[in-house]
Design a protein with these regions (language model features):
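N-terminal glycine-rich flavin-associated loop
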Residues: 46-77, 81, 99, 103-148, ...
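Iron-sulfur cluster-binding electron-transfer modules in prokaryotic oxidoreductases
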Residues: 529, 536, 690-1018
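Ferredoxin-type iron-sulfur electron-transfer modules in oxidoreductases and energy-metabolism complexes
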Residues: 550-581, 585-723, 841-847, 885, ...
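Terminal amphipathic helices with adjacent charged low-complexity linkers/tails
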Residues: 274, 308-415, 454, 599-600, ...
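A glycine-rich phosphate-binding loop feature that marks nucleotide/adenosyl-phosphate handling sites
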Residues: 88-90, 148-155, 239-247, 314-331, ...
Length: 1018
C-alpha cells in the first residue's frame, strides 16, 4: 500500500491574502495555489526548476492592472511577480518564485486587423501559428519564425525578442512590433509607439512614473549613444535585454520605448497587448535540400547559399537527421530527403527561396542547382546531392521536421540527454565554421556527444551537448562549458544569446555589455521597477539595490530527479524523460495531441503536466523510503484481504472528508487523460501517458477504493457477450429514464451504448464463417488457406456495432476470400486503461496464447477497430514481453492493401468519400489515411482525408459523467465543424468510439470504410 503524502510545500499567508483580496476587488480571471498547479509552472523547456507560490490567469488588461495596483500596496511590497507566456523558454526566463502571471490561458484574442496599413493588434497570449492561421485569408503572415511556433505566445516572443529561420531577411520580433500596451507595477498603463524625439523629451518632463521612465531611457540612451554603438555587436541577432541600441533611430529623430520592452523578459512591465507589423505572404516558395558528406562541409558551404540570394539557410547535422529517421515525422519527408546511393549524408542545408516573381525565383534556384551539379561533378565542397521541393505542402513538411528536431534531441538514448544552455550562440556568419570547429573541439575534449542544427545564414547554430543532470559532476561540467563558451563567443565577436533570451544566463551580461553599459541597464530597470519585484534575478538588478542575479548553476530538474532511485527512474522513464518541449500545448484543434489540454487549457491536463506530477510523486515516495517497483511486484494476483479492504475503505472515507494527499492531485490529472496514446508517438520524447497512468492508478488503488464504474468498465468484456444473448431486453432496461438517472448519479456513467440488434451471432446464424472449427481450419490445403481470412472480434464492434463486423465478413467474401469469424476472446484494453494491470496481464496472456495458436495456421488475422488491434501490438508487448509471441493481427486496411496489391487502380470518378481516422490509428500509423485512399482508388472511388483532432469519446471516457462536458467540448473543437460541412452519408470513421460520438452528438451516425467498400464494389 502506498503511503499518504500529506505534506507539500505550503503557500505563505501573505500570498493567500493577496489572492483573496484580488478576487474581492473584481478580478475576473483564475487563481491557483495547489501544489499540482505550482509544479506545472515550475519548469519550462529549460533544465531549471523553481517552484512559484501561486499562479494567476488574468482575462484582460484590466485584470492585470488590478494585480499591479494591489501589488503596489505597502502590505504586499514583499511579493514578486513574473509574467509567463507559452512556457517554452529554454533558459528559465519565466521561472521564479512568487506569483506567476500566466497570459496564455485567457488573454488570447486577436483584437483588430488593418490589412490596408499592414498591422494587427493582439493580446499577449495569442500563439504565433494561431495568428498566422488568422492572417492567411488576408494574404499576410507574422514573419519572425521559431520552432515552437504552434505553442509559443506572442507575448513570450516579444519578451525574448525571438527569431529563427528567415531572420536574415525578416529580422527579429522587435523589428515587427509597432507598439505595446504594458501595465507597470502600480497599475499605470503604458502605450508605446515611435515618437518624435521632441515629444519623447516632453513626456520625460512629466512628474509621473511614466514620465520618469521616458526621462531615464531618453537621457541614458542619448548620453551614452556612442558607447552603445561601439559596444553592441554588428550582428543580425543584435544584443537585446535591454535594447539600448535601437531606442533612437539612426538619424536620432525618432524615439521608441517599445525597443526597451522587447527582450526585457518581464522584468520591466506586464505586456498585455501588441500592435504588430504583418508581412505579405510570398506567392512563390522553393526549397532546395542540399546534402553533404560532413557537417563541416555544410557549414562552410552555407555562405555560398546566402550569396545565391536565398531567403534562409537552415543546417542540420547527422545526429539530428538520424533521430528524425527514427521518428514518425520521417514518414512525411522521406521522399523529399532521400539518401544518395553509395554516400553517407552527414549534413543537410535546407535552402529556401521566396518572393512574388516566380520567374525570378526560379532563375535563382536554377542557377544554384547548376552550381551544385558542378560541385558534385568536381567533388568539391562536400556536396553529394540535392533535391528541390516546389510544392508548398512539401515545404511545410520539411520545416515541420526541422522544428521537431529540437525535441527529438531529447529522445536520445541513455541517461545523458542533449540539453539547452549554450544553444543559441551567435557569431558573424563568416566566422561560424571556425567557431563551430572550436566549439566541437571543446565538447570533444570532454567526451560529450551533441546535436547541431540552426540558422547558419545568421551565424546561429543550436548546439545541445548531452549531459546527465542527475549526475552532480556533469552538472558542474555544464557550468564549466558555459564559461568556456562565453569566452569562445567573445573571441569571435559574437553573443551567448542569439535568439532565446538570457534567463538564468544573465550573470554573463557584463561580459558582453561591459560594466559601464551594464550600469546603464540597471538604471533602466530602476526606472521601471525600482524595488526589483518583476521577475527578479533576470537581466539585471535595479540601480541602488544590491540584489542577487540568477545563476547558470541554479537549482535544476535533475537536482530533484536524482532523489529518485536509478532503477525507478529507468522503469518510469516514460514520465522521467519529459524535457518540457511543450509540443503537447499545440494550439491546433486538428492536432491529435493533447485533447484534454486543448479543452481545459489547464497544463496539468497535458502530457508534460502529468509527467511533471508523476516525477514529483515518485520523488516523494522515495523520500518516504517507498519503492514503487517493489509495491508493483507485491500486488496480489487475485482479490484483496478483508484487512486491506477495511483499510482502503477507511482511507477513502478520509479522502472524501478532504484529507490531503498529494496522490489525489496526481489522480485528478490522470483522470482527465483520454488514453488516446497520441503522446506516445507525437511527442518528440515519446512520453506515453496512458502507460504510466495505468501504473499510477494500480498503485493509487492499493490505498483507496476504486469507484464502481471502474469495475464495470474493466469487466465489460465478460458481461457484454452474456447481455448480447438478449439485446432487446437489455436495451429496454438501459433505456428506462430511472435506470439512466441512477447510472449517472450512483455509477457516474451517461449515455450508455445500446447493444446491436440483431446481434452479430444472430446475423451470422448459418453462415459458414461462424461455423468452422479449429480442426476444419487445420485440414484446409495450402491453396484454401491462402484464400482464408480470420476475423478477430473486439468487444465494442462485435457487441455494440455488429453491423460493421458482419459487413466486413461480407466484404471479404465479395473479394473472393473465405472469412472465418474467430471466437470472441477478451482484448483487455479497458482493464489496462483503468489500471487493472494484473488482471490485464492475465487477459492478455490468455488471448495471446489463443492468437498464437491461430497464427500457426498461416492465415491472415484481421480486426476492424484500430485501438483494439493496436493494443495487441503495444500494450501486449509491454505487459507480456517475449511471452506475447509472434502473432500479428492486421487492421482492415493493412489486409486489404495486401490482398488487392495486384489489382490495378480504376478510373476515379463520382462524389468523394471522407475519411476520419481514429486518433490512435493516425498517430501510430500515419500512412493509414493514404492506404485507405489507395484501396478506394482501386475501385474507382475517391477518399479524402479529413484533418481533425480527437472526437472526445475515447472508449469509455465520454461515457463518464464527470467527463461529459469536456467530451462534447472536444468534439466541438474540430469534428462538429467537419460534420456540418460534409455530407454525412459520405463520412467514414474507423474507430468505434468516433462513430459512437458522432451518433450521440449529431443524431445520425457514420459508417466504417469497409461498409462503404461493400457498397462500392459491384
Amino acid at each position: 500500500m502506498i503511503p499518504q503524502i500529506s505534506q507539500s510545500p505550503g503557500v505563505v499567508q501573505l500570498v493567500l491574502n493577496f489572492l483573496q483580496e484580488l478576487e474581492q476587488q473584481g478580478f475576473t480571471g483564475d487563481t491557483a495555489t495547489s501544489y499540482a498547479d505550482r509544479l506545472t509552472m515550475s519548469t519550462d523547456n529549460s533544465i531549471y526548476q523553481l517552484l512559484p507560490d501561486a499562479v494567476v490567469f488574468p482575462r484582460s488588461t484590466a485584470d492585470v492592472a488590478l494585480i499591479a495596483r494591489l501589488a503596489a500596496q505597502e502590505r504586499y511590497s514583499s511579493l514578486i511577480f513574473t509574467p509567463r507566456g507559452g512556457g517554452t523558454g529554454t533558459n528559465g526566463q519565466a521561472l521564479n518564485q512568487g506569483i506567476i502571471v500566466d497570459m496564455s490561458r485567457h488573454m488570447n484574442r486577436i483584437i483588430e486587423i488593418n490589412p490596408e496599413e499592414g498591422w494587427v493588434r493582439v493580446e499577449a497570449g495569442v500563439i504565433k501559428d494561431q495568428l498566422n492561421q488568422y492572417l492567411k485569408p488576408f494574404g499576410y503572415f507574422f514573419a519572425p519564425e521559431l520552432s515552437t511556433s504552434n505553442r509559443a505566445t506572442l507575448g513570450g516572443m516579444i519578451n525574448t525578442d525571438a527569431s529563427g529561420q528567415g531572420s536574415l531577411v525578416y529580422g527579429k520580433t522587435s523589428d515587427h512590433v509597432l507598439g505595446v500596451r504594458a501595465v507597470l507595477l502600480g497599475g499605470d498603463i503604458l502605450d508605446t509607439q515611435p515618437l518624435p524625439v521632441e515629444l519623447a523629451e516632453t513626456l520625460g518632463k512629466s512628474n509621473t512614473t511614466i514620465g520618469r521612465i521616458y526621462n531615464t531611457v531618453y537621457q541614458r540612451c542619448r548620453q551614452q549613444r556612442q558607447l552603445i554603438i561601439d559596444n553592441f555587436p554588428k550582428l543580425n541577432r543584435f544584443l537585446t535585454g535591454y535594447d539600448l541600441r535601437h531606442v533612437f533611430n539612426d538619424e536620432m529623430t525618432e524615439f521608441d520605448l517599445t525597443r526597451i520592452l522587447t527582450g526585457s523578459e518581464g522584468t520591466l512591465a506586464f505586456i498585455t497587448e501588441a500592435r504588430l507589423d504583418i508581412t505579405p505572404l510570398p506567392k512563390v516558395r522553393r526549397l532546395v535540400n542540399v546534402k553533404y558528406d560532413s557537417f563541416d562541409s555544410a557549414l562552410r558551404n552555407a555562405p555560398f547559399m546566402v550569396e545565391a540570394r536565398a531567403l534562409s539557410v537552415e543546417t542540420v547535422d547527422s545526429k539530428v537527421l538520424n533521430l528524425a529517421r527514427e521518428d514518425i515525422v520521417w514518414h512525411s519527408v522521406s521522399e523529399l530527403i532521400t539518401d544518395v546511393p553509395d554516400k553517407e549524408m552527414l549534413g543537410l542545408n535546407i535552402v529556401e527561396f521566396a518572393g512574388d516573381d516566380e520567374a525570378l525565383i526560379d532563375e535563382r534556384v536554377n542557377a544554384l542547382c547548376v552550381r551544385l551539379d558542378e560541385l558534385i561533378a568536381s567533388h568539391q565542397a562536400g556536396v553529394i546531392g540535392w533535391q528541390m521541393c516546389r510544392e508548398l505542402a512539401g515545404v511545410e513538411r520539411i520545416y515541420a521536421m526541422r522544428k521537431k528536431a529540437v525535441g527529438l534531441l531529447g529522445n536520445a538514448k541513455g541517461a545523458a540527454k542533449p540539453i539547452p544552455f549554450a544553444e543559441d550562440t551567435c557569431v558573424p556568419p563568416e566566422h561560424l565554421a571556425d567557431y563551430i570547429a572550436e566549439f566541437r573541439a571543446l565538447l570533444d575534449s570532454h567526451g560529450l556527444s551533441y546535436g547541431m542544427f540552426g540558422h547558419v545564414d545568421a551565424g546561429v547554430l543550436h548546439v545541445r551537448p548531452a549531459l546527465d543532470m542527475c549526475d552532480p559532476q556533469q552538472e558542474i561540467l555544464m557550468k564549466q562549458i558555459s564559461d568556456d563558451v562565453v569566452a569562445l563567443t567573445a573571441k569571435y565577436g559574437g553573443l551567448l544569446w542569439g535568439e532565446h533570451g538570457k534567463g538564468f544566463r544573465a550573470e554573463y551580461s557584463p561580459a558582453f555589455f561591459g560594466e559601464e553599459l551594464f550600469a546603464e541597464l540597471r538604471k533602466v530597470k530602476a526606472a521601471f521597477d525600482p524595488h526589483n519585484r518583476l521577475n527578479p534575478g533576470k537581466i539585471c538588478p535595479p540601480e541602488g539595490l544590491d540584489a542577487p542575479m540568477m545563476k547558470v548553476d541554479a537549482v535544476k530538474r535533475g537536482t530533484f530527479d536524482r532523489q529518485i532511485p536509478i532503477a525507478v527512474r529507468q522503469q518510469w522513464r516514460g514520465a522521467m524523460e519529459c524535457n518540457g518541449n511543450g509540443l503537447c500545448f499545440n494550439f491546433d484543434a486538428r492536432s491529435p495531441m493533447c485533447p484534454s489540454m486543448k479543452i481545459t487549457q489547464n497544463r496539468i491536463h497535458s502530457p508534460k503536466g502529468r509527467a511533471t506530477l508523476v516525477r514529483e510523486w515518485l520523488r516523494l515516495l522515495a523520500d518516504r523510503g517507498v519503492d514503487p517497483l517493489k509495491l508493483e511486484q507485491e500486488l496480489p494476483e487475485s482479490g484483496v484481504s478483508l484487512r486491506t479492504l477495511i483499510a482502503r475503505t477507511r482511507n477513502s472515507w478520509h479522502a472524501n472528508k478532504d484529507e490531503y494527499d498529494f496522490s489525489h492531485e496526481v489522480k485528478e490529472a490522470m483522470s482527465g487523460c483520454l488514453a488516446c496514446k497520441a503522446c506516445s508517438t507525437q511527442c518528440p520524447i515519446k512520453i506515453d501517458v496512458p502507460e504510466f497512468r495505468s501504473r499510477f492508478l494500480q498503485l493509487y488503488h492499493t490505498r483507496y477504493l476504486r469507484p464502481l464504474r471502474d469495475h464495470l468498465v474493466a469487466t465489460v468484456e465478460s458481461y457484454a457477450p452474456l447481455m448480447a444473448r438478449a439485446p432487446k431486453t437489455f436495451n429496454f432496461f438501459i433505456n428506462q429514464p430511472l435506470v439512466r438517472k441512477l447510472s449517472e448519479k450512483h455509477i457516474g456513467m451517461v449515455d450508455l451504448p445500446l447493444l446491436s440488434v440483431p446481434s452479430l451471432q444472430q446475423q451470422m446464424v448459418g453462415h459458414r464463417s461462424a461455423n468452422m472449427t479449429l480442426e476444419q481450419l487445420e485440414a484446409l490445403n495450402a491453396e484454401q488457406k491462402a484464400r482464408t481470412v480470420l476475423v478477430v472480434q473486439d468487444p465494442f464492434t462485435s457487441y455494440y456495432d455488429a453491423q460493421v463486423v458482419a459487413d466486413f465478413v461480407r466484404l471479404v467474401e465479395k473479394l473472393g476470400f473465405q472469412p472465418v469469424l474467430l471466437p470472441f476472446s477478451p482484448n483487455g484494453k479497458a482493464q489496462h486503461i483503468k489500471g487493472f494491470l494484473n488482471r490485464f496481464a492475465k487477459t492478455a496472456k490468455k488471448t495471446a496464447d489463443f492468437l498464437n495458436r491461430m497464427a500457426k495456421l498461416g492465415m491472415p488475422m484481421v480486426g476492424v477497430d484500430p485501438a483494439l488491434v493496436l493494443c495487441y501490438r503495444d500494450e501486449y508487448k509491454l505487459a507480456l514481453g517475449e511471452e506475447r509471441g509472434e502473432f500479428n493481427v492486421l487492421l482492415a486496411n493493412e489486409w486489404l492493401a495486401s490482398a488487392l496489391e495486384s489489382q490495378p487502380v480504376a478510373t476515379v470518378s463520382g462524389e468523394s468519400w471522407y475519411f476520419f481516422g481514429h486518433c490512435t490509428e493516425v498517430t501510430a500509423l500515419p500512412g493509414a489515411p493514404a492506404q485507405w485512399a489507395a484501396i478506394f482508388a482501386r475501385f474507382g472511388a475517391k477518399l479524402e482525408n479529413v484533418s481533425v483532432g480527437c472526437c472526445g469519446m475515447a472508449g469509455t471516457y465520454g461515457h463518464e459523467a464527470k467527463n461529459h462536458e469536456n467530451s462534447l467540448g472536444i468534439y466541438e473543437l474540430s469534428w462538429h465543424q467537419a460534420m456540418q460541412r460534409l455530407p454525412r452519408n459520405r463520412c467514414l470513421a474507423t474507430g468505434y468510439s468516433c462513430r459512437s460520438q458522432v451518433k450521440r452528438v449529431e443524431g445520425t451516425g457514420v459508417r466504417h470504410p469497409v461498409q462503404a467498400l461493400l457498397e462500392i464494389i459491384k
